[in-house]
C-alpha cells in the first residue's frame, strides 16, 4: 500500500461492552498525539513502523478506556487529526476470522529467513570442522 490515508479503527470487546481500543494509523509525523485530559483514557506515544522495502514510514498510536461511552473521535481530540481521516461506522467490526482468510505470507521473506538459517548452520559446521582439524593437528 503506497501512501495510505490516515485511519482510526475502534475495537470493542465482544464479551464486555465497556472495554474499547482505538488504533490511529498512517498519520503524518507532524501530527501531535497528546494525552487526553480525561483520566480514564490512556494514549500511547507515537510509534513509527519503518517499512524499508516500500520506502515508507507508518505512524500509529493506541488509545483505550474502560468507559462504555468511549469513542475514538473523542480520544484524540487534543491531536490535530487530518480532515480526510477514515472513521469506520460503529456497525462495522473487525472479525479475526475474516483477517485469517485474507492473510498471505510473503514468500520472499520466508525464503530470506530460510536462507539465513541455512547460512548459520553452514557457518557452525565450518567452524566445528576447523576446530576439530586444529585440535587434531595440535595433538599429533
Curated annotation (Swiss-Prot):
Pfam families: DUF1968. Glycans are attached at residues 32, 66, 77, 113. Residues 139-140 are cytoplasmic. Residues 19-107 form the Ig-like C1-type domain. The chain crosses the membrane at residues 116-138. Its main location: membrane. InterPro entries: Ig-like_dom_sf, Ig-like_fold, TCR_alpha_C. It comes from the Eukaryota. GO terms for cellular component: alpha-beta T cell receptor complex; plasma membrane. GO terms for biological process: adaptive immune response; alpha-beta T cell activation; response to bacterium; T cell receptor signaling pathway. Disulfide bonds join 22-72. It is found in: Cell membrane. Residues 94-115 are annotated as: Connecting peptide. Constant region of T cell receptor (TR) alpha chain. Alpha-beta T cell receptors are antigen specific receptors which are essential to the immune response and are present on the cell surface of T lymphocytes. Recognize peptide-major histocompatibility (MH) (pMH) complexes that are displayed by antigen presenting cells (APC), a prerequisite for efficient T cell adaptive immunity against pathogens. It is linked to Immunodeficiency 7: A primary immunodeficiency disorder manifesting with recurrent respiratory infections, candidiasis, diarrhea, and failure to thrive. Patients show a clear predisposition to herpes viral infections, and features of immune dysregulation, including hypereosinophilia, vitiligo, and alopecia areata. Other features include lymphadenopathy and hepatosplenomegaly. CD3+ T-cells express TCR-gamma/delta, but little or no TCR-alpha/beta. Alpha-beta TR is a heterodimer composed of an alpha and beta chain; disulfide-linked. The alpha-beta TR is associated with the transmembrane signaling CD3 coreceptor proteins to form the TR-CD3 (TcR or TCR). The assembly of alpha-beta TR heterodimers with CD3 occurs in the endoplasmic reticulum where a single alpha-beta TR heterodimer associates with one CD3D-CD3E heterodimer, one CD3G-CD3E heterodimer and one CD247 homodimer forming a stable octameric structure. CD3D-CD3E and CD3G-CD3E heterodimers preferentially associate with TR alpha and TR beta chains, respectively. The connecting peptide (CP) domain contributes to the TR-CD3 assembly and signal transduction. This is T cell receptor alpha chain constant. It comes from Homo sapiens. The gene is TRAC.
Amino acid at each position: 500500500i503506497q501512501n495510505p490515508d490516515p485511519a482510526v479503527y475502534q475495537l470493542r470487546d465482544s464479551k464486555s461492552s465497556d472495554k474499547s481500543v482505538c488504533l490511529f494509523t498512517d498519520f503524518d509525523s507532524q501530527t501531535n498525539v497528546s494525552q487526553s485530559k480525561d483520566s480514564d483514557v490512556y494514549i500511547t506515544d507515537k510509534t513509527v513502523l519503518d517499512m524499508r522495502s516500500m520506502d515508507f514510514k507508518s505512524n500509529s498510536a493506541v488509545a483505550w478506556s474502560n468507559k462504555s461511552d468511549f469513542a475514538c473521535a473523542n480520544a484524540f481530540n487534543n491531536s490535530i487529526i487530518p480532515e480526510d481521516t477514515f472513521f469506520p461506522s460503529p456497525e462495522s467490526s473487525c472479525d479475526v476470522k475474516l483477517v485469517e482468510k485474507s492473510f498471505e505470507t510473503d514468500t520472499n521473506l520466508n525464503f530470506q529467513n530460510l536462507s539465513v538459517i541455512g547460512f548459520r548452520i553452514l557457518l557452525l559446521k565450518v567452524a566445528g570442522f576447523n576446530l576439530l582439524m586444529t585440535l587434531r593437528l595440535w595433538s599429533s
